[in-house]
């Protein structure tokens, strides 16, 4: 079946239509479905992949691969991961550092300590659970270090980060009635 996630989304969102037209490129869609399937299989049994290609000039969706294999139940293939709420992980770190630069709190060569640090009850760790001592902001970002990012967010303020994210058109999902915490630096938001 061609582009099952895109087809299902179109029919679900416009059930009154008898004819549904999609802007997908058949060739690109087929290539990306194959690519997603091959890469997910190479990464492991429970790994999936999703791809959404949009023409920035027209807004047309050229390819919509919602999972690595629609029929693979072990990979939850029927779930369209292009629309699923996901943690942003480390993708917010450049925004955090950018806010610090704008506020004059830091610049790329500012030294920051990558050492075990507690913020009240919160004690973030690096992905590899190692510490690098004094590093520049540039190095911290290049190595996606968690502790420096949380330290900078502590100086900038989580609310300011959330405001910036909203200003670029993204509505973060926070636990109801909770203020953003330092955990948002590491993707503690959907």
Show the residue positions of the predicted features.
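Penicillin-binding protein/beta-lactamase superfamily catalytic region
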Residues: 8-12, 22, 150, 154, ...
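Conserved catalytic neighborhood of penicillin-recognizing serine enzymes
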Residues: 1, 5, 9, 57, ...
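Active-site-proximal helix/loop microenvironment
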Residues: 171-190
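Alpha-helical transmembrane segments of multi-pass membrane proteins
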Residues: 91-94, 143
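Active-site proximal loops enriched in glycine and acidic residues that flank catalytic Cys/His/Asp
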Residues: 55, 63-66, 116, 153-154, ...
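Periplasmic/cell-envelope proteins involved in peptidoglycan metabolism and beta-lactam response
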Residues: 1-86, 90-92, 103-107, 159-168, ...
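Short active-site loop/helix that positions an aromatic residue
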Residues: 99-100
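Short beta-alpha connecting loops at secondary-structure transitions
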Residues: 77-83, 121-130, 181-184
């Amino acid at each position: 079946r061609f582009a099952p996630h895109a087809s299902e989304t179109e029919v679900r969102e416009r059930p009154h239509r008898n004819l549904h037209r999609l802007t997908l490129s058949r060739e690109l869609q087929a290539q990306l479905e194959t690519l997603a399937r091959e890469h997910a299989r190479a990464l492991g049994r429970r790994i999936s992949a999703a791809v959404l290609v949009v023409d920035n000039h027209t807004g047309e969706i050229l390819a919509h691969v919602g999972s690595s294999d629609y029929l693979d139940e072990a990979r939850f293939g029927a779930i369209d991961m292009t629309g699923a709420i996901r943690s942003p992980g480390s993708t917010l770190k450049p925004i955090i550092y950018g806010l610090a630069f704008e506020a004059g709190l830091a610049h790329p060569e500012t030294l920051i300590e990558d050492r075990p640090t507690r913020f009240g009850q919160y004690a973030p760790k690096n992905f590899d659970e190692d510490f690098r001592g004094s590093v520049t902001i540039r190095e911290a970002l290049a190595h996606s270090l968690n502790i420096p990012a949380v330290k900078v967010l502590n100086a900038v303020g989580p609310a300011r980060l959330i405001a910036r994210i909203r200003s670029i058109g993204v509505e973060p999902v926070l636990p109801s009635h909770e203020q953003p915490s330092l955990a948002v630096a590491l993707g503690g938001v959907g």
